[in-house]
């Protein structure tokens, strides 16, 4: 019951006063299944990209964090090829920082901030993390190419936005990206736990 009343309030607030570059809405009839969209920030390799996310609200919300994953493929050290996100506020303590006082808007804003400022010391994608740390020009080039390929609004003949590719679709992650997801590098790097 608490989940339903809180979700209604949060969705109403998100509709009335959405954070800049973020939208969130109910997906179908089930209130616990939401969709969100984050616009890539200016001066980032994700600029002009439109990134769709899936948000599932657990039964014990707000005492458990929502489960959020990217549907749009993204080249990022903290987001894997399945769209899973390594971010402390998406996990319960002691390993995470979720608190019942946080809300969906806060989480989406935190994800938007992570897009702008990756954390290469807590990666899901070891190779991309190394690239970000030691060869930023290559990282930015690759991230821009992925954004162009997967997250740019396509228009039809009449100039109307078309649909965006989703993970697992015909334009999903490349075989190389899937391989990177399975590779762990040595050297004492810490990898995102419990994702």
Swiss-Prot record:
Its EC number is 2.3.2.23. It catalyses: S-ubiquitinyl-[E1 ubiquitin-activating enzyme]-L-cysteine + [E2 ubiquitin-conjugating enzyme]-L-cysteine = [E1 ubiquitin-activating enzyme]-L-cysteine + S-ubiquitinyl-[E2 ubiquitin-conjugating enzyme]-L-cysteine. GO terms for cellular component: nucleus. SMART domains: UBCc (SM00212). Residues 146-195 are annotated as: Disordered. Pathway: Protein modification; protein ubiquitination. PANTHER family: UBIQUITIN-CONJUGATING ENZYME E2. This is Ubiquitin-conjugating enzyme E2 T.
